[in-house]
Amino acid sequence: MSAPQPHDLLWGMTPAALPVDAPAWATQVLAAGQPVVVRRACCAAGWVAVGLRGEGRAQRLGVQMRLADIRRQLRPEALRGQGTSPWAALQALASVAPVLDACGLAWGPTGGVGYQLATGVEVLHAASDLDLLLRTPRPMSRAKARELLDSLDCSPCRIDVQLQTPAGGIALREWAGVAQRVLLKSALGARLVADPWNLLECAA
């Protein structure tokens, strides 16, 4: 099993591992055997920062999970939509798949779409966005980012793509824009950088 990365889904955390003041819904989620999602935060050795997802945006909880408790790990790129769906977000996933596959980079759905595909739990609704992760180990030009964004903006719902660089995550929409610096999110927090692939700048 590889080291957990942001947006990976992990199974194996139990209600007993929750803080004593955790809400009842969080206990129910873990008791039902649902996964947690890896988030960006620093942890002590042997632990990983994760988030629990309940019903609606109000039910979110950030906690830590022991690496030794992980029983299953699923990355976004392992998830793909199957068949037709009444939800615009899943329709969008099917429509953009050929465009993203043509990039030659690893990618996959995150957020509600990824969670529903992985668990079968119905969390999507008519206004759901499609969140995607695109792994970009090497720099993507801003012209290429604009081209990709243009090809995705004709989908039936809003699509938010995060580019995962070696230093952290940035929004495709920002990288395709005109601002000289963009917001890079990492385990150390968020900061504005000019080159999100420059590890020295991102660590400064």
Swiss-Prot record:
Its EC number is 2.7.7.66. It is an enzyme of class 2 (transferase). It comes from Pseudomonas putida (strain W619). The active site is at D129, D131. The gene is mdcG. Transfers 2'-(5-triphosphoribosyl)-3'-dephosphocoenzyme-A to the apo-[acyl-carrier-protein] of the malonate decarboxylase to yield holo-[acyl-carrier-protein]. Keywords: Nucleotidyltransferase, Transferase. It catalyses: apo-[malonate decarboxylase ACP] + 2'-(5''-triphospho-alpha-D-ribosyl)-3'-dephospho-CoA = holo-[malonate decarboxylase ACP] + diphosphate. Transmembrane segments: none annotated. It comes from the Bacteria. InterPro entries: Holo-ACP_synthase, MdcG_C, MdcG_N. Belongs to the MdcG family. This is Phosphoribosyl-dephospho-CoA transferase. Pfam families: MdcG, MdcG_N. GO terms for molecular function: nucleotidyltransferase activity.
